[in-house]
Amino acid sequence: MSYVITDETKLTGIIGRPIKQSFSPKIHNGAFQYLNLNYIYIPFEVVQQDLSKTVEAMKVLKFRGFNVTMPHKREVMNYLDEVSENAKIIGAVNTVVNQNGKLVGHNTDGKGYVQSLEDEGIYVKEKTFVIAGAGGAARSVAVQLALDGAKKITILNRTIDKAHDIAQLIGMSIPNVHIEINCLENKTLAKAVEEADVLINTTSLGMYSMEEESIIGEEKVLPSNLVVSDLIYNPAKTKLLQQAESRGCKTINGLGMLIGQAAIAFELWTEVAMPIDYIKKTLFTR
């Protein structure tokens, strides 16, 4: 199908630095074309000192919306007219919607993760989760799990201060969930997963160029009834997921979250559901 840009084409995009590694243009433009929507998604590399001017330009040019990636997810909140509840708690925005000239910030990362679980028949309410890592992704996921009714969340990180920050944030904002923290070590992880429903790796261990690394030393610490989830999607099967499979665990990689968070943004902009099956089959099948 030909893809013709006209004066009626609705503009969307992504701002960040670096930006060339982003899969978002591939996902969104693929979905726009498949659905024959007159939209386009453009990546923009934006340095920090130009962020406020860029956001204002998006409003002036009547962008329907845009994504925000590192390093601007926090600072962009200063230049928006409104921010959603979960984005306020997380303290970061990754999606902006232009609502009749008012820029509204959202965070779809955690929601995209929860959607990826639900797509596999796993529902958050009253479940017990163990999260390895305490960076931005862990924060987004932990907050959304708490908002959606998780029973208990244990956060393990090599530097416990960052885990404490997330626990304190959730404790102040969402008091009905039980939060524990500890250092990320073989012993503490083994103990934490004994009674957990889902283990989530949010660290970089196992990603491309670190394929032989894992958050666990020996797979025997993983109970066979544990769901093991890795936010990494390249490679599709990390060492952690291989270890989990050898124990009979159900495994989920990060592709579902990647597409899930994009799908939520897509629908906020277009009011049309993203063709998720098409995106998975045609854009991410090797």
UniProtKB/Swiss-Prot annotation:
EC number(s) per entry: 1.1.1.25
Pathway membership: Metabolic intermediate biosynthesis; chorismate biosynthesis; chorismate from D-erythrose 4-phosphate and phosphoenolpyruvate: step 4/7
Binding site for NADP(+): E85, G133, A134, G135, G136, A137, N157, R158, T159, I160, D161, K162, L231, G254
Pfam families reported for this sequence: SDH_C (PF18317), Shikimate_DH (PF01488), Shikimate_dh_N (PF08501)
Keyword Membrane: no
Top-level EC class: oxidoreductase
GO biological process: amino acid biosynthetic process; aromatic amino acid family biosynthetic process; chorismate biosynthetic process; shikimate metabolic process
Catalytic activity: shikimate + NADP(+) = 3-dehydroshikimate + NADPH + H(+)
Active-site residues, as the UniProt record annotates them: K73 (proton acceptor)
Binding locations of shikimate: S22, F23, S24, T69, N94, D109, Y233
PANTHER family for the chain: BIFUNCTIONAL 3-DEHYDROQUINATE DEHYDRATASE_SHIKIMATE DEHYDROGENASE, CHLOROPLASTIC (PTHR21089:SF1), SHIKIMATE DEHYDROGENASE (PTHR21089)
Function: Involved in the biosynthesis of the chorismate, which leads to the biosynthesis of aromatic amino acids. Catalyzes the reversible NADPH linked reduction of 3-dehydroshikimate (DHSA) to yield shikimate (SA).
Subunit-structure text: Homodimer.
Family named by the database record: Belongs to the shikimate dehydrogenase family.
Protein name: Shikimate dehydrogenase (NADP(+))
Gene name linked to the record: aroE
